[in-house]
């Protein structure tokens, strides 16, 4: 079991960001259950970059909490590269306050949520959303965090 993380800090204010150890801990709680070897990039960005990427790839004219870009290798190529997660620092901080969640718990949730997207999970259809949210809740609770959707229930 091996996870390789390329952590890129591309935001102006690095104060109070989770550590690389935090990110690795969250990834190790999720990925090995689905894929024993994995390589991925987590890029922490400001609202401007998140907004640009969200607009370019999703047609949404605003920044978002996490964007997932799965790597799709040709069928004949075996590679452990999962893809990239782009997480917007300001959106995560804002949402944690709005949802009355500890900031570290919300960071962990964004890593879990984005990782599941890289693994092929989605939440477009109601049934898929229920499955994904249930899995997120289970994984978060295994790490000692509360149900991330508690406020919505």
Swiss-Prot record:
It holds the Pfam family YbeY. Its main location: cytoplasm. This is Endoribonuclease YbeY. Binds 1 zinc ion. Keywords: Cytoplasm, Endonuclease, Hydrolase, Metal-binding, Nuclease, Ribosome biogenesis, rRNA processing, Zinc. Zn(2+) binds at residues 113, 117, 123. Its cofactor is Zn(2+). Belongs to the endoribonuclease YbeY family.
């Amino acid at each position: 079991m091996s996870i390789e993380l390329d952590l890129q800090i591309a935001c102006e204010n690095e104060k109070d960001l989770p550590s690389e150890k935090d990110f690795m801990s969250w990834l190790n709680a999720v990925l090995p259950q689905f894929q024993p070897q994995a390589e991925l990039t987590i890029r922490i960005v400001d609202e401007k970059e998140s907004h640009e990427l969200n607009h370019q790839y999703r047609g949404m004219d605003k920044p978002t909490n996490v964007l997932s870009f799965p790597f799709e290798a040709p069928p004949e190529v075996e590679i452990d590269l999962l893809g990239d997660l782009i997480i917007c620092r300001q959106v995560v901080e804002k949402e944690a306050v709005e949802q009355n969640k500890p900031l570290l718990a919300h960071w962990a949730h964004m890593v879990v949520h984005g990782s599941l997207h890289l693994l092929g999970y989605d939440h477009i259809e109601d049934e898929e959303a229920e499955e994904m949210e249930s899995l997120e809740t289970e994984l978060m609770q295994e790490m000692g965090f509360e149900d991330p959707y508690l406020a919505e229930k």
